[in-house]
Amino acid sequence: MDLTTPEVAEHPDVLRNMSRYTLGLLPSEPPVGDMNNEDSDTNTSITQSPTNSEKLTDILQESQDTKALQEKYLQNIYALTQNQLFKNVEDYSFYNLNREKFQRDKQTIVGVMRKRRHVLNKKIKRLQSHWKQVLGRWEENIARVDRLTEIDKTKNAKKSEPFIKRSTRKVMSNFTAGDIVRSEEEFLEILAKLEQQEKEASNVSEASRIATIPPMILSEEEVKSQYFNDQSRLVTDCPKFYHFQSMPDIWNEEQHSIFVQQFILHGKKFGKIAEAVPGKNSKECVLHYYLTKRTTDYRALVASATKTKGRRRKKLLPSQRGGKKKSKGSALMVDIEAADINKTEENINNQFQEASVTADNMNTWDNTPSVENVESANENVNNHNADEQMDEKIKSLVEGNSAYEIEKGAQEPDPMSIDMTDKSETVSGFKHDVDVYDTAENEGNNTLLQIKESVHEKTPTQDEPMDISQDTIKQEDYYEPKLEQHSSSKRNSISTRKEEDAASALANLSAVGRSISAVDESAHQGHLPGWDEKEEALIFSLAQGMNPMKMPLTPRRASTGPRPRPTFQLTEIDSPNRRRASDCITPSISKILKMVSEDAKSQRIDELSVEDQEHTTHSSHTTSDINAFPNSQSFPRASIHTLAALGEDIVERQSKNDKIV
């Protein structure tokens, strides 16, 4: 068989094995041939380090005797590759050979195994004897400890109270003949049996809970035979195993923006981030983070996101947050609004008609309408001799502001412009006409009912002039009795109108109270001319500095007839046992006064700041007017009965709500 055959060329391993095998068999000296020295020199120069296979091929080509060995060797190798399968092990040729070899070496193997067993038995006996010695010492120690504990128990038993012995007859009657112990040996035997039963029961219960202990391995051969192969998944080539072939970090802008958004939400939870980023897994997200962390400041992005969340939360309204509840004052306004919306069209028309009549009967100093005729209103005004100076002062202030508003209205229509000529009235963009029965015997509850029924809106038209005197007030000029306009505007402004009414009343009371110069004389005289008892209480308290003192309540009148009016002395006002006059007003309305006065002042100042240069002369005068009389232009003034009745109604509603809750 030649080496150039395709069968040999397909098996290069055969040539290598054959070279190793034949080099050991063939002689080291090469046979004499027809090779020239020149050829050998040229061969060595071309291949300076020939391999064994090349040497072997040269030798086989020159020697004809080695061809037979080559053919035989190759035949043996190919014969081994053809595996023959047998059902029984005895059918294989190597089985009989191994059996003969075992029979020949059997005695030697048995002697070695017998010697190992003998050594192992001696070791076991030595360990058992040692264990018995240790066990005996341990049992002696346990017995000694038990005796000491029994001695301690007997000492403690003697110190305790003596045990009361019972009669032996009853005890013996419970025993039967079979329970009687005849001797001490039987007694000890019974005790031993009981102890044995207890031990067996305890051993059975413990054996069910304790794991089985395997036998000890005493010989080295057993250790080797029970060797556990822990080379499962063994890493032989560490650099190749732990090498991470990084793929190019190719991310488009959309993927990067999604990655940044998810990183702000989830942080370094790259598993969740990879779910949102299309076409990327968690490993790629981790790699992208560490490659871009120098160029993109992820920590700053997370910090800015948390800051913006906090700011947005602070800017939310209380109604949006849902944390702050409405005050009781606003709840009252909602109730009044619901009652007003349910009014019928007929009642609304009646209110407009009543408003046209009462608009001519407004009082000049408190700007509140009256149901009485013009003569009775003039008489009440003439009775205020002590307040004429304050009336003139208010008139001058309003006249100055009205002149400025008229000039402003000529340039652009302004619904808040004012004109005052000869005790004229303040005309607001949203004027509230309140129908109140201001009589000497008037009570707060009746007044509140009239407030709820007669509150409406007066809207001046744009085509009409803004300078309107008291003599030219007409319903068709000032009011547009359209039901659609009235109902739509009423829903939006009903609550603010009630607050404005109460706030303007407080403002006027404060101005009138501070204008009284001789409080002592009025108090000693018994009452103020033209004022009822509740009005006097409010005026006295306001004159002392905006309700710093306790004031008495309005006395009840008997059913038989009116009781004489009490005199309000300064000693009674200073009494701490009296209620404040502001309790009838409720603190919520006093807060409304402060809020409305500040808003009106700031709004007025803002309007003045953007005016033209020609109106700058009026700015200082208007600002001083606002400080002196805060709500003279913002809202119309209501009567004191309106204020007191509203306060009493608030107290009643609060008590009813508390009972319901």
From Swiss-Prot:
Keyword hit for Repressor: no
Alphabetical list of InterPro entries matching this protein: Homeodomain-like_sf, N-CoR_corepressor, SANT/Myb, SANT_dom
Keywords of this entry: Nucleus
Protein name, as recorded: Uncharacterized protein C22E12.19
Annotated SANT domain residues: 246-297
Compositional bias per record (Polar residues), positions renumbered to this chain: 42-52
Nucleus keyword on record: yes
